[in-house]
Amino acid sequence: MPNKYWKYENLKSVHLELSTLCNSICPWCPRYDNFSPNLNPNIVEGAYSLERFKKHFPVEFLQQIRMWTFAGDYGDPCTAPDIILIIDYINDYTTHSPTIQINTNGGMKNEKFWYNLGMSLNENSYVIFSVDGLEDTNHIYRRNVKWHKVMNAMKTFSSTGAKGIWEYLKFRHNEHQIDNAKEMADSFGFEIRFKNPNGFEGEPMPARDKDYNIEYEIYPAKGVQIAPIATSSREFANRIDTLNYDEYKDKVESFYKDRSTCITCSANHSFGGGYEIRINHDGTVWPCSFFGHLSKKYLKGRTVSKVQQWQAQDIFKDINNNLEELTLKEILDSDPFHGVYSKWEGNKIMLCSDVCGENKMMEKIYA
């Protein structure tokens, strides 16, 4: 095992959460509390400005980055007022042509914005439109997203000749529309990808109102089984808030010891043999998107991911990983993720084993 992963000089890819603002109210989204439209209390709403971006990512740093991913767990990057200015800054001051991937639900802004966004992208870059159905079904999961705005966005963007990808989460309520979606994607000149969603926590996914009443339930596509959650797992997760992690650390690290898997870290990919990092809107730096996702997730009364979050909070409790206080080089030179990679053997880090083990329990959402 190398002495240190995530060396500053080896970075080739950055996954940045540009914004914690969003027009959509997707039930499982960690931006919201317990499948409701109520904002997660851990979230501070805001968006990266161009000036803040320049401060965190100076011109000399741009030169080593081959890929930028603008996708958020807590917001849609296209809600950021300065997103096009940031893209222009990257393209204008990078001596090569980096790939910029943007994930969006497409339900915000106007035609001028989508035209300008398409025109701002270089030949290696693209937008992934997360649209889960057609006019009568997309809003079932993408709550509050207006279909006419999505269509205006996709049509206008496609008219620029920029590369677009339609990403379609398959549910029981929209799987009958797959062929129609393929035809529509062809009309835009978009590739279309179909994926199975996360978010089924031992039962159908509830869509709750602001008072936490269930308005309706969402089911996976036919043939996809909802994995049950053992009663013992629920009981342990419910006790976590009253327990001292130090007393249970060995137990947590042994939960997956019998898995016949090895961890192949997705953040250690092939962009010149370098590594990817995730940076949340608040400036915190994480080893990957999954740790960034977990860092602000509000799990009161929940079971799934609660033990993983408990473990992660202990791993990172003594590190300073915030770009508002240190430079990215200072953060990574301190080897902040040693507590992650040093325990990959034996599947001791639950989140890593779940998402990057041989038997992945989660499908990677980001391309």
Predicted regions mapped to residue ranges:
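Recognition helices and adjacent regulatory flanks at domain boundaries
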Residues: M1-L11, S24
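Local cysteine-cluster metal-coordination motifs and their immediate loop/turn environment
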Residues: L21-R31, M350-M361
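Conserved SAM/AdoMet-binding glycine-rich loop
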Residues: L21-S24, R31-F35, L50-G133
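Conserved beta-strand->loop/alpha-helix structural units within folded catalytic cores of enzymes
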Residues: K12-W28, G72, W166-K170
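Radical SAM enzyme [4Fe-4S]-AdoMet core and its adjacent flexible, acidic
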Residues: E9, E17, Y32-Y48, L62-Q63, ...
